[in-house]
Amino acid sequence: MRKACSPAEPVFTHPEFDHETRIVSAIVAGVSVSSIYVPNGGKDFNAKIRFLEALIAHAHRCAAEGQPIVFCGDLNVAHREIDVHPKERKETVIGQLPEERALIGRLLAEGLVDVGRTLDPENDQLFTWWPPWRAMRQRNIGWRIDYVLASAAVAAKAVACAAYREVGTSDHAPVVAEI
């Protein structure tokens, strides 16, 4: 990957969030690859919504310019019901609210593909985050809020995408895609 990287100016900037360094990007073999950490919304739900709307606008610009992209990281939204363990499903909590899920839908409508879900569409155990109590991680009672989203042409080259639950350095599992 190092040989395929090239320096680039920031491709997604937002004055409200830049000081938090919520996005790190690089151009890899002509593809804009961004690691993203969406605000969880607990302290300022509207800031989360503004961030997601800005991300959608950025994806739209990239699509209009023909720039292939990969967004990976913590989006802090369980997009669909299958992305939350039945014991954790609560459509009234942040991370599962209909308006948040709709924004992820809008992001995908900009031509992005959910690589993990595409490669394993019916798996209801693809969780990437677990509440830090009652051995939730060990029992795999969690949420899928970490993703690899890619432009269709890039996603078509994906051969694998997995969450490594056994890596316990965080309350999230790293998600790795092989493209």
Predicted regions and their residues:
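Surface polyanion/phosphate-binding segment centered on an Asp-His-Pro turn
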Residues: 162-179
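Short hydrophobic/aromatic beta-strand or adjacent loop that forms the aromatic wall/cage
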Residues: 20-25, 144-146, 172-176
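Structured beta-strand-rich core segments of catalytic domains in phosphoester-bond hydrolases
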Residues: 1-40
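Surface-exposed cleft-lining segments at the edges of enzyme active sites
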Residues: 13-14, 37-52, 88-92
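Metal-dependent phosphoesterases centered on the DNase I-like endonuclease/exonuclease/phosphatase
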Residues: 53-141, 145
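Short, solvent-exposed helix-loop connector elements
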Residues: 130-131, 158-165
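Short Gly/Pro-enriched turn/cap motifs at secondary-structure boundaries
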Residues: 14-15, 137-140, 165-168
